[in-house]
Amino acid sequence: MGNVTVAWEDVISVIQMVRTHLIVIGAALVCMILLMVLARRWAKPLRGFIRWQSFIGFLLITVIVVNVMLIGALNNTLNVVLADRGELSQENADNSRQVIEEITNEGVVMTKNDEDFLPIEPQKINVFGWASTNPIYGGTGSGTVDASTAVGILEGLENAGFETNTELSDMYREYREDRPAISINDGQDWTLPEVPVADYSDTIMENAKAFSDTALIVLSRTGGEGADLPHDMGSIMDGSTMDVGTKYLRGSYTNNSDEYADFEAGQSYLELSRTEADLVDMVCSQFDNVIVVYNGANTMELGWTENYDQIKSVLLCAGAGATGFNALGNIISGEVNPSGRTADTWVRDLTQTPYYNNIGHFAYTNTEDVAAAAQADGIVSFVNYNEGIYTGYRFYETAAEEGLINYEDTVMYPFGYGMSYTTFEQTMGDLNVTEGAITVDVTVTNTGDTPGKDVVQLYYTPPYTNGGIEKSSVNLIAFDKTDILEPGTSQTLTLSFDEEDMASYDTYGRRGTS
């Protein structure tokens, strides 16, 4: 059996699972002790008999409860711990690291590249932002990554041939070494560590400008199981979120300065903090060529990147795993041509999203019968899903067609959006229908001067009758990505789907119609 590492959160979780069983054993122990004490009142033969019987009774209850625990609540845990473990070969480990890097090669999304600023040759580069020294590698809970052995953003840049400004990175590490924990069991610390602009001395900035005329700003946001992202940071900072719970619904935030608050009431976690906004202002006032890297899986408000002519390029890089940040360096250098696409719609103002009022920390007030069993110290929480079929891009595309929103004013980056260092042309062939299966050929030609991959996305618009079955105006039904295409070369992709894939469900008449 291989080495088993145990995290404190795992211990807490196991204790919570068997809490009722432990209470039963504890009650049996108390009863045994009471009987042994009371037995002192009886004569010696009876006293001994009662004590032995109480001990045997306690032992029997303990054995039964422990067996129930092992068969029930702890069954899966024991299987994980006691099961035979295979050894991971070095070859498989190396292959896994390579796969992680390849996934990031395919997934990083470039959303802005004014003046074709990227790619740039490996050179000296100033990397600003505390997150550059402590990036997001994955989600929370089961999505965590061992950061101690992972390739970070700075290391990924250096592996690609860039030289980073160590005076900046040393300052960030000295400011704070660890990332605030978003814990399932111990509450959530939503603090966004960032060195206040006032702490950047004239010497540091003069040295940075002498080091390189190019700056890269890294901003990150974490998120995962255990808590919704706060949409009112003011309530997090003033502690009012504590009113509805003490565990899953608990949140805290520590400001980066005593001179101001990082967030005002009503601002969400996915907006720039005051310290981050000051950092962007400072960097853009000192450097003409700025790259922004957003490291996070959630759709942050990025409209501010359009307010600075100095911000030439924007890259979206979610949790990159153990080795994925090598890909980020390779994309900036041009070793890899970005081909990722957005997996959600990025909006300019999150308060205008259809789900905004239905997310957050909502708690039931009439659940006394189940509250005792709730993990959140008696708090039973919920989230409302009211969007129906209009989730993600389906809402924005349909709302724009119906005149409910102005698409350009609302949407920052559409679903399926992403830029490349080259250009492509796509030519769609005729639809072929055979026994309910539909295929179509799409020929992609690299019309630029740089090798790269392109993504073909096939959408359909179903017929809609006012008052009929709800249907979104645009629906993704198939997609594929080309191989690396050299300039002037083409590749034909065949996309296929079934007619049934375009069917709609009548939730009121309970009958499927196409």
Protein language model regions, located:
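C-terminal non-catalytic regions of proteins with extracellular/luminal or membrane-system context
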Residues: 1-514
